[in-house]
Each structure stands twice: as C-alpha cells, then as structure tokens.
Amino acid sequence: MKLLTNIGTLLALSPVQQVSATPHTGEHYNLVKLEGYGSVSGTTVNSTLTKKDLPTTVDAWMGIDYALQPTGHRRFKAAEWPKPFKGVKRADSYGKTCIQEIASKTPLESQSEACLNFNVFRTKGVPLSKKLPVLVWIHGGAFFSGSWASFDGAAFAASSKEPIVVVNFHYRVNSLGFLPSKLFKDEGLSNLGIRDQRLLFEFVQKHIGAFGGDKNAVTIGGRSAGGHSVGIHYFHNYGKDNKALFAQAIHQSGSVTSRAFPNDTYPLYKTQYDEYTAYLGCDNKKTNKATLKCLREADIDSIRNISTKIFYDYNDVLTWPFQPVQGGPLFEKPGSQSGYDGTFYHVPTITSNVNDEGKFYTPGNLETDSEFLDYLHNISPALTKKDLSELSALYPDPAKYDNSPFANSPNSTQYNRISAAWSDYAYICPGQETAYRASTAGVPTWKVRFNTNNSFPAWQGIPHTADTSYTWNGESTQYPEISHIYHGYLSSFVTAGNPNSHRYPGSPEWPAYHGDDESPLQIVVQPGDTKVEKDEIRKEACLWWRDPERAPRLNK
C-alpha cells in the first residue's frame, strides 16, 4: 500500500467551483477608486467554494491585478507595480491562477502567466468609510501549486463575529516563482514568488483603505508553504526591506525554519536545474543573457510539464525542487539566525500544527533502522554519523524495542517512526521555535495543536492539511463544532488581536504561550475536549532539532 499523498491529491480534495456572485445591474456596485491606479466595481458572494449557502452574504471585489503581469519579457523578473487604467473595471469574478500542474482546482483553462491578482471579501452592510481589520492569506501547495481555491475567503469573512476584510491572492509558484540556480543568484532573480507576496503587501498598504480596510490592522496568515512564507516575512526585520507591512501573523503548519531552505548553489538544486534547462533546450553553459533569453522564450506548456515532472521525480523522498532560498532577496539570513539575533517583527503571532503532520507525506515502505536513517540523511545530507546515531536513539526503533512509542504501525515497521521524525523536523519543532523566539522577546504569542480529523483514513492519524476547511468554518467538515471553535479563535485574533475576545461560546480561554516556562501552555483543538495542555510533545527531540549548533547542517 502506497501511503504517500501527492500534491495532486491535495489539490483534488475538493472540486473547483466558480463563485456564486450576485449580478448587479445599473450603477456600479460598491465602486472603489484606487488612487493612482483606477476604479473597480464589486459584487456580492452568497455561497462557499463548494456551493453551500454562506451564513451571510459578503461584499466582494475579485480578480484585480496588483502588478504588471509577468509575461513575455517580464517572465523570470521581479514583479512591478501595475500601470494606471481609465474607466471602471468589473471585479466580479476570479482571475487566472498561476501556471502549475493541471488538477481539479486548477484546470488548464483557469491558468495563465498573467496571474498576479487578488480578491477582497468584506462584511456586508458596513460603510466603506469604516476601516475594518484585514486578514491577508497566503495559499500553500509546497511552493509548487495553489490558488484562490485553496482558501475560502468569503466563508472566513461571512463567519466572523466581528466585521472583517479578507484578502487572498496568487503568487508565482514552481519554476516560474522559484528556480534556485547560480544564474538566478547572479542575476538577482531568486525568490520571485516571495517577492510577489511582498508586492501584494505593499499594494494592500496603499489601497486597502479604499475597500474599507485598516492598513494598520493587517494580519498575514498562511498554511503550509503559505505558513513558511509568513515565517520568511515575519523573520525579515533587517536590511533594506524591513518596513513593517503587517501588524500580526498566523503561522499555520509553517515556519521560517520548517523543512529546509538551502541556498542557490545547493548541489541537488543544480541537478534539478540542469534537468530543467536540458528539457527546455536552454544551454546553461552559455552566457547568462543567452540562457535567460531562452528560458523567457520557452513554451509555457513545456515549462508546466517539466516543472511537474521534476517535482514528482523528487516527491517520494521529499527533496522538492522550486523552493525559496536562503541568501536570496527577503531571505538573506537563515531563519534560525534571525531568531537568535531577534531580527523579526515583534508583532503578535499564532503558531499551529496538526498532530500527525508527516503522515500526509511519509512513505509506508521503510522496514529497518538503516532505511529510517538513510531517508532522513538523504533529506539532510550534512548530518554527521553522530547526528544519525542520536536520531536513532531519540526515535526508538520499533523493530528493536517493543515499548517504542512508534510500534504497531498500520503498515511498514517504520511508518509511525519516520512520520514522527519528519513531522518534528519539518513542522512541529519549527513551530515551537517560532513560538519560543517570539514569546521570549515579549511578543504576545499563542500556540495550538490541532487534533481533529477531517475524513482521513485512521492509519493517517491527523495529517497535514486536516485543519484546512476548519480554518474558515467549513460547512461540511467531519466535526462542525470544531469549525466554529477554530475559526472563532482565528477570526478573533484578526479582529481583536487576541483569540479569546470573540471566541466561539463555550470554548475555553486560550492562554498565551511563554517559551521560557519549563512547560509552556498551548491549546489542543479536538472533538468534545478542546482544552489547555502543556507543550511537551517529544520535548527532547524538539530540542535536538532546534539546536543552534545543528541548524546550519539542517539548512534552517
């Protein structure tokens, strides 16, 4: 039985749906003038992405460009501010998604390189003159895929107890947004997708007031790759781009130290880049100018095809291509070092993890201690023999020790063990590191362990993405009350700066996290028993993964 869930499966978890927008005839509905840019008219939305009725109708403006589109000679260039336009543009339907794997949420006809657009959802009936708190959500998808359909902004806004503005948007993904290479390093073209995100933040600061949003009350949030993105921005309070563009942050299954983010010259990235350029017929031994010209003129279907092929060639061993790189723009310093130096934005934050993150990804065919260690060593080649020996002890081998907490796997001997170790490496301990650094610097911080299934098979536990639909109070989740509770905490954080102020009735008070306590408190969200608990999951292992001496070997 193959237990690895690929990104295509993730994208297919719910079918793509067009927004149910109410047509407005006659005068333009909710006409908004964006100073120095142009005017757009809005619409209303009354249903979720899965065609269920929203609790209340929301105002919406959709498919608005926030940049000059990266097409033609602008492919593989940093995004630029859009040019002004005359007249009124109708903003009543979603814009194109960025080029990526063809899947149910991102069919071919929905895709375009001209994809840098955003959507705004706002509580209906509140005058635009009243400036409301704003949530800007960054979609996930391993930096390989994702779109507006990854986060139901209308549902999040409609379910908020207090008036709110929600923004979601597209940024370039896979090779068009992230192509680690010496060429891109030399030409200053690394981390284009992260730079797209920052341009959107700047656009929000300039124009969100026209949509009735408060630019001084912006929360950025994201899950998975979106959460890693939040971490990259949160831990970048240094250099020339250190102006605060947000007031709060939600790191959902993500962190600046999640997984690993090597630099442009990482040997595996060179191998992947060589495969990429060879497929496209671009000789990377020519001058930078010649190679870039070839890449910019390459057929877009060929770019989609080779990006998808290379991603899945490395998916089983979790050494993904097309990632943000340390040393590149907005990520000049390793995330761990920025934490040690305190060069992050000291603004309130939430960090979250689901209980069994790694079971969404890890393989079900490892049987021996050697295979367990080889798998981790392949992901982090700089680990020493001593490191590997310590890992073997930290995660007792169920084939050797009957009392190992990782015994009784549902399939291969090592499945529970490798899932726990990779969860700690990629998500759980990095989330703890973020909470520790923020809270010990005096920043209001809250941490959550999400322990609620959403129809995954029992052998997968509570895997990565289990919390997705609960975030926006999804109407068809396995445990609807958890949707109310979880969304209540998050929307309260956005609107009041504290997850408790407008939490769902009957849900417990969520205490702030204090990383310098021996056992800091967090909340566990689970059916029938959401409660406060101590943050003690695999405590010794997390200290190992978070060790500053080891961080460079882990590319954290």
Swiss-Prot record:
EC numbers: 3.1.1.1
Keywords linked to the UniProt accession: Glycoprotein, Hydrolase, Lipid degradation, Lipid metabolism, Secreted, Signal
Broad EC category: hydrolase
Residues of the signal peptide: 1-21
Biological processes annotated in GO: lipid catabolic process
Alphabetized Pfam families for the sequence: COesterase
Family stated for the protein in its record: Belongs to the type-B carboxylesterase/lipase family.
Entry note: thermal dependence: Optimum temperature is 35 to 38 degrees Celsius.
Role played: Secreted lipase involved in plant virulence. Has a substrate preference for p-nitrophenyl esters with a carbon chain length of C12 (p-nitrophenyl laureate).
Molecular function GO terms recorded: hydrolase activity
PROSITE patterns registered for this protein in UniProt: CARBOXYLESTERASE_B_1 (PS00122), LIPASE_GDXG_HIS (PS01173)
pH dependence: Optimum pH is 7.0.
InterPro entries according to UniProt: AB_hydrolase_fold, CarbesteraseB, Carboxylesterase_B_AS, Type-B_Carboxylest/Lipase
Subcellular localization: Secreted
Organism for this UniProt entry: Gibberella zeae (strain ATCC MYA-4620 / CBS 123657 / FGSC 9075 / NRRL 31084 / PH-1)
Protein name: Secreted lipase 4
A single Gene Ontology CC term: extracellular region
